Amino acid sequence: MPLSPYLSFAGNCSDAIAYYQRTLGAELLYKISFGEMPKSAQDSAENCPSGMQFPDTAIAHANVRIAGSDIMMSDAMPSGKASYSGFTLVLDSQQVEEGKRWFDNLAANGKIEMAWQETFWAHGFGKVTDKFGVPWMINVVKQQPTQ
C-alpha cells in the first residue's frame, strides 16, 4: 500500500489545489466541500467532535496526484496560518528542466531554503517552502552506480 501525506490548510485549501495544479501540474482526483457533505455527516454546534465550524465552501477532503504520487488535503482549521514541521515533501524528476521548473514555480512567492544547484548526488536539487508554508525538496537524481 502506498503512503500518502495529508496536508491541513487554514481555510485556503481550494487556493492550494489551484496553485499545485498551476505550478506542478497536479491532477485533481477528488474534492468535497463541507457544504457538499450529507447533512448527517456535518458537525453541528452541539455535537461537533472537532469543536470547529467550517464554512460550506471549505474543503472537507481532496486528493491530488503530483508526479504519480497522491497527496490528500483539507481545510482543518477555519482560519489562521497552518504550520508544517518535521517533514518535507520530495518531488523526484528524471529531467533537469522539469525539476528546475517545479523549483522555480514553488519558489515564486515562497522561500528558497537551498538554491537550485547540481550536487554530488543530483543533476539538480533545491529546497523551498511554498507560499502556503509547505516544505519541498526537488531532486533530479544522478544515475546510481551498479554494484
Swiss-Prot record:
SUPFAM superfamilies to which the protein is assigned, alphabetical: Glyoxalase/Bleomycin resistance protein/Dihydroxybiphenyl dioxygenase
Disulfide bond entries: none
Disruption phenotype: No effect on phosphonate metabolism in B strains.
Signal peptide (residue range): none
Family annotation (Pfam families): Glyoxalase
Transmembrane segments: none
Top-level division of the source organism's lineage: Bacteria
Protein name: Protein YjdN
Organismal lineage: Bacteria, Pseudomonadati, Pseudomonadota, Gammaproteobacteria, Enterobacterales
